[in-house]
Amino acid sequence: MAHALETVERSKILIDHPLLSANNGRYSYKIERKGDQSLYSVTDGITTIIMPIRWAMGASSAIGQTYILEKDGQLYESRMSWFQQLHGLGPTLGSAGVLPADLHEAAGRLMSHGDKLACFGCHASNAAHGDQLTLDKMIPGVQCGHCHQEVEAHLASMLEKSGQPIFPPKLSKLSTEEMSNFCGQCHRTWAEIAMQGNPSIANIRFQPYRLTGSKCYDPDDARISCVACHNPHEEVSAKAEDYDAKCQACHAGGKAEANACPVSKSKCVTCHMPKIELPGGHYKFSDHHIRIVRAGEPYPG
């Protein structure tokens, strides 16, 4: 999470790939490294637009990286992103098949104030104060204070050594439902996606939303919470067997509502949380809608 956003100077992907190029329709794109900066350009063969890359979002991840561009004081989301699976550039998620009206639109999508709050608010720390962007005080990546709120007030109260000390909320005391909503502030909650009214495979990457739809989901059972399987202070394990003990915490047998699997007791998530390709995302996400998956069944949106 500490690399959810990187400055262009420190982006390993941009450093390791000093020249990237791709075509999309009638437009040609290029990202070139110049010293410790990277320039993003798009041309229609007649006119060329060049923008400096300011930040890389999703930096150095196994999935990909989208770029935040700047021109005339405005920020833009790059129309092309880098994808690990492609080892190169491809249309940014959500822009595939979209026909830009002109060269400027082909370069990137103008970010609204709400876009900036949402993107920087989840990919960085101290990027906003209420509804006010504070990019001058922003710390790239998800740092301690992003989740452990009120740490500054806690530090100040301890240094003063007078009065009642202030302690940050204990996240370990959150119920499963509260934890889903807490993580869902960035990973999307059930309520947020359900209110959009668009149940589709595009929601595969929103884990709290998908988890809530599982038959075994219990808002008060800590064994099905986000942190029961994932330690936010560590990288997510890609080994299926690393989650077996978590599954067996409920499915060891003895309870009718949580029978042991008759097929296997190892690599449970391989069958019950299958990896599904996100269209346009060039990555297979583990579906957190835990279930008995049957061949040929439609995707449970």
Give short role names for the model-derived ranges.
Residues M1-S60, T66-I68, L89-H104, N126-G301:
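Primarily the internal scaffold of c-type cytochrome electron-transfer domains
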Residues D72-M111:
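A short, surface-exposed interaction/processing loop segment used at functional sites
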Residues M111-G114, P219:
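Short glycine/proline-enriched loop/turn "hinge" motifs that connect secondary-structure elements
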Residues G114, H123-A127:
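C-terminal substrate/ligand-recognition segments
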